[in-house]
């Protein structure tokens, strides 16, 4: 138990650094905003529909973030065909991601909430604390696959107020104690993408999900925190064999 936990905490730390210095939260927001830009340019979809499709609760939320990224409103961008977005998406149509839409049951988690810049959080210590808590409270060992939830949009929320929950999924209930919380993640419908390959290609994976898969799927993203699970350990796995699960919460268009 503890040896595996210690080993896995280092692996978790490596994963969080694998995004080439860009925190996951910023990365997801930027990718969503670029997806909006593509839909504005290449589709006739109304701006409100685009906002809901990529997971914003209102067109004004999308407009605010879009303006912060590009200095121009979604409507101005749609009407000004000469405006070029600096970072082109890396859509790889040949990238075959296994994906399924799945009803995920409720899950029990213990978690440590971190406040502050996603880049500066000490994920390693947080994971170690969860492992220590399990041993102290004599709880059954949870999943050794780290599960992280990012609650805030770093383009809208000041860095010091950003909230991250580092979670361990448990087989049973636990009682919160001190700064370690317990909660049940609600059951829900998710698009779950399974990517096999090196972490440095995750940007292309997200771009491909938002640019290719989401527009083709008959569903919309819920305005909710996304999550990731890391299924194996880079310390003893070849980069091309690494498995990453990406969870995106869904609503069906018929809802």
Language model features: what each stretch is:
Residues 10-18, 22-30, 34-41, 45-48, ...:
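A solvent-exposed interaction/effector surface
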